[in-house]
């Protein structure tokens, strides 16, 4: 069984001392490729994921500004993102979007930076990775007006209605460890109705470890539990989930 972790954060301090061992465990679990998300701790640290991807052949990267860091953006930020995106290991743009849960940046600033990054990603012809938390209606309104192209709704935690809205926009939906939580019945209902060709899996490491590791530092090898739960929800085998999600990821990023 070969799997792709479509969203992880391997560049931060939580993996500073044992990343080689983490990636060895991922390989042993069948995780053959990983997409590490290049938001860092905001500008000017978005290059950290690219540096990780350059070190490991199985790791690829994105670049972008997380909505938490929208207030740190300067005009130079967009030039830096454009330059980093020229690296052949960069295969996506994100994670970008809106986060009204923490409001680390003013909402108007978040929206402006989101729109500008959509323009940049469109020009670069890169798929986008969307982060949205307690901001779905504003997120989807902006996408309807400013985006036409492929993308991933990362860490899908919505219900079936939100899933349909994302699918109608042409997005793929990525499910992570939350799918295994006892409180996630609505997420599992949504996961059951996503078409085969729009389904992805992810970890969002080091966050949101699946049961039985909930509350621990997450790592890519743990994704097998999410895959097992997703297979159970959809009435198929884990091998089927692995095959379709790997194919979908490769199609999405043009590889």
Each predicted region: which residue ranges?
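Mid-domain alpha/beta scaffold segments of enzyme catalytic cores
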Residues: 1-255
